[in-house]
């Protein structure tokens, strides 16, 4: 099979493997890449290539993740696999690799284990919308009833965390057999079934350009005779000259009109997701807009101060705090382009949070920020990152 160049014609979907240590996540990742590259083209990756995951930084946090790409008949997938449990926690909370769906790997020989549960909970908290299950090591279980039992346990666990356990596709197989070239129902056939489940069960994600217009404010200038220009990178959607937009966050929401879009000193009639632009605002004063606010389509996003979040607190060796923090700890929360002070309320059963922990917290900010569930942020003290988080639920 000749190597084909990367065709952007197929829709692109981001997935990743989650599940307990040693249940076969990396073996499955290698098996999928190997089997699908033979079936649909692309490049196979060996197990040890995936396991030696390079370090990357996301929001000031070092994470090891391996990236693999593969294709099915209908789609192009980017797949992330993490070597260690801590890397999963960090990856999911920082959104370093935002997942449109996850492949939960569970060993049929062991059944659900503590990290199986923890990864499902994390997936729920950070907003991974779909989970497909691969019941691995089925070649080691002779008893069909036992397989059924494990499958039931996994479905119950998914339902417990508000995933549709009864409707979730569960594929039985053996990643090891598939990787070794076994063509049978446990090997290649299981991987092909998994690919089909990914194609049909995980919907094609909305592209950034199709969303409601949103641009975080990075800088504000006053240009004599022209008015106020706000610069930034459009996160999603399209803004057209003449459209009404809202300025949201920090201060009371203001309505204004876009009277011009500028990119590389050229005037455009519209700006779209991914563009670094200057947006000219009619009748808006320079001091009415500041970094940390967003420009957005009216009514599409609202400002909030009170929310729950799933956070990861950096360990001492990662440049984080050296000491635990307690209830009412007041760091800065860095949303998009600015810091806002807020106080942290810990869960009732938690007296303190140690460096290296992940925990669910409740936050009250001193100023409102345009937010929605799934928004990422960094936790900082005097400009250095001490943690990362994601908005789980907006309270007020």
UniProtKB/Swiss-Prot annotation:
Residues 81-84 are annotated as: G3. It catalyses: GTP + H2O = GDP + phosphate + H(+). InterPro entries: EF-Tu_GTP-bd (IPR041709), EF-Tu_GTPase (IPR050055), EFTu-like_2 (IPR004161), EFTU_2 (IPR033720), G_TR_CS (IPR031157), P-loop_NTPase (IPR027417), Small_GTP-bd (IPR005225), T_Tr_GTP-bd_dom (IPR000795). Residues 19-26 are annotated as: G1. GO terms for cellular component: cytosol. Its main location: cytoplasm. The gene is tuf1. Residues 174-176 are annotated as: G5. GTP hydrolase that promotes the GTP-dependent binding of aminoacyl-tRNA to the A-site of ribosomes during protein biosynthesis. Residues 136-139 are annotated as: G4. PANTHER family: ELONGATION FACTOR TU, MITOCHONDRIAL (PTHR43721:SF22), ELONGATION FACTOR TU-RELATED (PTHR43721). Mg(2+) binds at residue 26. Belongs to the TRAFAC class translation factor GTPase superfamily. Classic translation factor GTPase family. EF-Tu/EF-1A subfamily. GTP binds at residues 19-26, 81-85, 136-139. Its EC number is 3.6.5.3. It is found in: Cytoplasm. It comes from Polynucleobacter asymbioticus (strain DSM 18221 / CIP 109841 / QLW-P1DMWA-1) (Polynucleobacter necessarius subsp. asymbioticus). This is Elongation factor Tu. Residues 10-206 form the tr-type G domain. Gene3D superfamilies: P-loop containing nucleotide triphosphate hydrolases, Translation factors. The lineage of its organism: Bacteria, Pseudomonadati, Pseudomonadota, Betaproteobacteria, Burkholderiales.
């Amino acid at each position: 099979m000749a190597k084909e160049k990367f065709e952007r014609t197929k829709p692109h979907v981001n997935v990743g493997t989650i599940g307990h240590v040693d249940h076969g996540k990396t073996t499955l990742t290698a098996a999928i890449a190997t089997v699908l590259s033979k079936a649909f083209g692309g490049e196979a990756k060996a197990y040890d290539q995936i396991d030696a995951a390079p370090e990357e930084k996301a929001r000031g946090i070092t994470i090891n993740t391996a990236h693999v790409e593969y294709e099915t008949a209908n789609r192009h997938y980017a797949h992330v696999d993490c070597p260690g449990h801590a890397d999963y926690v960090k990856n999911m909370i920082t959104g370093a690799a935002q997942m449109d769906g996850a492949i939960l790997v569970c060993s049929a020989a062991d059944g659900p284990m503590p990290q199986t549960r923890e990864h499902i909970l994390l997936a729920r908290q950070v907003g991974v919308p779909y989970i497909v299950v691969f019941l691995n090591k089925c070649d080691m279980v002779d008893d069909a009833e036992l397989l059924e039992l494990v499958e039931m346990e996994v479905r119950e666990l998914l339902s417990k965390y508000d995933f549709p356990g009864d409707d979730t596709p569960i594929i039985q197989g053996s990643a090891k057999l598939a990787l070794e070239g076994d063509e049978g129902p446990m090997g290649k056939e299981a991987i092909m079934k998994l690919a089909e489940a990914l194609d049909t069960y995980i919907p094609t994600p909305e592209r950034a350009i199709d969303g409601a217009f949103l641009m975080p404010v990075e800088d504000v200038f006053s240009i004599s005779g022209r008015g106020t220009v706000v610069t930034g990178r459009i996160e999603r959607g399209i803004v057209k000259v003449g459209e009404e937009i809202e300025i949201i966050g920090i201060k009371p929401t203001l309505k204004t009109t876009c009277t011009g879009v500028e990119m590389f000193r050229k005037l455009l009639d519209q700006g779209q997701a991914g563009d670094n632009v200057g947006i000219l605002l009619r009748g808006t004063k320079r001091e009415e807009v500041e970094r940390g606010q967003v420009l957005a389509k009216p009514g599409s996003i609202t400002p909030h101060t009170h929310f729950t979040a799933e956070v990861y607190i950096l360990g001492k060796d990662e440049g984080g705090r050296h000491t635990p923090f307690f209830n009412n700890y007041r760091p800065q929360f860095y949303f998009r382009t600015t810091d806002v002070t807020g106080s942290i309320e810990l869960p009732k059963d938690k007296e303190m949070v140690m460096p290296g922990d992940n925990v669910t917290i409740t936050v009250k900010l001193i100023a409102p920020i345009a937010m929605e569930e799934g928004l990422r942020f960094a936790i900082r003290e005097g400009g250095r990152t001490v943690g990362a988080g994601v908005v789980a639920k907006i309270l007020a």
